[in-house]
Amino acid sequence: MHGSVRREGESPSTYSIADNVYMNSKIHAIITGDIVRSESIGLDKRDGLIKTLRCALEDLQRQSSMKMEMYRGDSFQIIVDNPVKSLRIASMLRAYLIGNAPEDEKNGWDARISIGIGAINYKGESIVVSDGEAFRLSGRGLDNIEKDRLAVATCWEDVNEEVDASIGFVDNLITSLSRNQARLIYLAVAEELPQVEIAGRTGKSQQNISKTLNAAKEPLLSRYLNRFESLITKYCGQ
């Protein structure tokens, strides 16, 4: 991957969820991302990767309506109408990719993701022609992400100070997940299923589910996401 921000003149492919449904608030979240080590993914697996990404976005509609466009083959940008849920969506998008990578994919699947939360001054039919602070924060964040895989920037300095000091925890937690941990943490955090229901769905004992989720630090992740969502809710309401 040689960049992170959509370049003028690039023709994105669009995958929309609730294209014309937007919050009344002018504050939105923009998720800009690209696939980690995309150049090493075989051509025979590219279609499966894109399908997995789209399936994740469709399922995560339970958290917020969204619109996604892909460009350059390995990059994507998403407008998230409910910024409160943006970090949950971004982290669970990564977990979905990790958990659904083919067993024979040596390096697995993952994405580098930057979240920008702020105003959108102009919202066109296509994300490529839209503009605003949220887009700039998200694009700049991915350009500067270096070796990390998750970044968040908002239009509120107080929020940025708190998030900057702690977002590395979420990044490291998601990056460290095994395929099995990622699949279970997705059910617990994205679908918000109780452990007994996860056990029934996966055919594993509740004891096994609890042990795996604790090893994956799911309770700490859920607590952090709840704190982030409370913080963004507070500032969006000001």
Where are these regions (language model features)?
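Regulatory and interdomain segments flanking nucleotide-handling catalytic cores
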Residues: H2-R6, E10-Q238
